[in-house]
């Protein structure tokens, strides 16, 4: 694969795939369930737990219904992409590997001010936290750099290193674009013509924003949340080849989390209820995490 400086959003992704593949990572595909962040992919949340080594990289579409702006905000989206890397156990040269990835996508580290700003990471919905840093390039955050300490309320041992790149924000910086919808999605010199990020996603942002804020029936969302909540212990109670169905159960946790985000966007969750819903999702995730670790340690 060519290692020339990427010219588009899609070639930036391909460059990161190429780079992390050469570092020994398995290049995965996005998880096919709605998630609020790339970290929630089972390749990170579950694979971070247990004793086995694991190195992977992937793109994950992420949905945050409350962040929709009908396509009128130049850098705020309800649907966007994150690039995730998980390295377990975390290598001693993890920072150098990360900086190498920035050079691979065309950032000259000699002319840009790269800073690691302490910002410990926490996701209470999945009972996870880690020691972390925001990575700033010339004063703008472009990545998150974390050493996982706990996931699902369980200690991560060996410690896993995680990198999260906000792809749209990073691409806007690399290509010098002020509006996300003006990003070149494919190479500008494509024989079939240039396509922008807006050509691909602007209408989706408009329609999904309307659905998120006004379209979904709140009563149905609450009913579906309760159904997902009921399914998790049922899945974990079933087994195949003496293994509880952790992966299907975790998918139900992700669905419950997305339903919560939709209800929140609709303004259907009172402040007093919010902590209760988050706690319910966290309890479900802890059940999955415990079952996963039990399987990994028995293998």
Curated annotation (Swiss-Prot):
**UniProt main location, coarse:** cytoplasm
Q: What is its EC number?
A: 6.1.1.14
Q: Which Gene3D superfamilies match?
A: Bira Bifunctional Protein, Domain 2, Class II aaRS and biotin synthetases, domain 2
Its localization reads: Cytoplasm
Q: Which InterPro entries match?
A: aa-tRNA-synth_II/BPL/LPL, Gly-tRNA-synth_heterodimer, Gly-tRNA_ligase_asu
GO BP annotations, alphabetical order: glycyl-tRNA aminoacylation
Instruction: Write out the entry's keywords from A to Z.
Output: Aminoacyl-tRNA synthetase, ATP-binding, Cytoplasm, Ligase, Nucleotide-binding, Protein biosynthesis
Catalytic activity, reaction form:
tRNA(Gly) + glycine + ATP = glycyl-tRNA(Gly) + AMP + diphosphate
Top-level EC class as recorded in UniProt: ligase
Q: Which GO terms describe its molecular function?
A: ATP binding; glycine-tRNA ligase activity
Write down any Gene Ontology CC term.
cytosol
Which range is the signal sequence, renumbered to this chain? none
Q: Give the record's family classification.
A: Belongs to the class-II aminoacyl-tRNA synthetase family.
The record describes its quaternary structure and partners as: Tetramer of two alpha and two beta subunits.
What's this protein's name?
Answer: Glycine--tRNA ligase alpha subunit
Q: Which organism is it from?
A: Caulobacter vibrioides (strain NA1000 / CB15N) (Caulobacter crescentus)
